[in-house]
Amino acid sequence: SDTTQAVRNTRRLVEEGAVAVIGSTITPNSLAMIDVVAEAKTPMISLAASKDIIYPVDAKRFWVFKTPQTEELMARAIVADMVARGVKTVGYIGFNDAYGEGWARYFEAELKAKGLELVVSERYNRTDTSVTGQALRILARRPDAVLIGASGTPAVLPQRTLKERGYRGLIYQTHGVANPDFLRVGGKDVEGTLLPAGPILVAEQLPSSFPSKRVALDYIQRYEAKYG
């Protein structure tokens, strides 16, 4: 999560003649790396989510690509599910960095478009060990649902704290937690979590009519055959 180190590593790679750079897996680092790869005219494939990594497609971002879905796309899916479940009021707590701010921006815009009310918005750092203050402020507003704009295992902390403090509403996470480590660290505290994910993660559960099911299953089979 050190943007300075990410830039340093990227510069070293392009100076050593790398024909492409794969990374970073997080939004702040990926954004910091753009200037380096653009200057070197070296393609970069980011594994982070933010739409800002690739848009607007200007002279610098011409060299940048990414694999995950954008937060804008996933925010639409989350809000659509909230509407379907009758949610009226929503709370948000996200990383105090480009990932959390990007999610807050697109999520709030989608809430407004669908007529839902954002009643509280909080931030925390990836390395924080307590979010009690933020959780209490969220609980005071009594939202029907809360979205945690975080990724990886640090996304567990707000959810665990809300549960421990008695929150009984719906808790949503981003596609940044769609991995075994989140489930391992979260344990019972993340039971019932709602989150969006790309079709490849649930390929076997998709109906046969789903357009990309066959392609997803083929990819999984090939990947597991080679890498286990």
Identify the role of each PLM range.
Residues 10-15, 36-39, 136, 164, ...:
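Mature extracellular/periplasmic domains of secretome proteins
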Residues 27-38, 144-165:
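Hydrophobic alpha-helical
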Residues 162-228:
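Extracellular/periplasmic periplasmic-binding protein-like sensory domains
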Residues 118-122, 134-141, 154-170, 175-176:
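Internal alpha/beta domain cores that form substrate/cofactor-binding pockets in large enzymes
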Residues 3-19, 80-81, 129-142:
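Short, well-structured alpha-helical segments in soluble
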Residues 19, 61-68, 136, 204-209, ...:
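Second-shell loop/turn segments in exported
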Residues 17, 115-123, 142-145, 167-168, ...:
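A local structural motif
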Residues 4-5, 18-122, 170-198:
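Extracytoplasmic ligand/sensor domains, especially the bilobed periplasmic-binding protein
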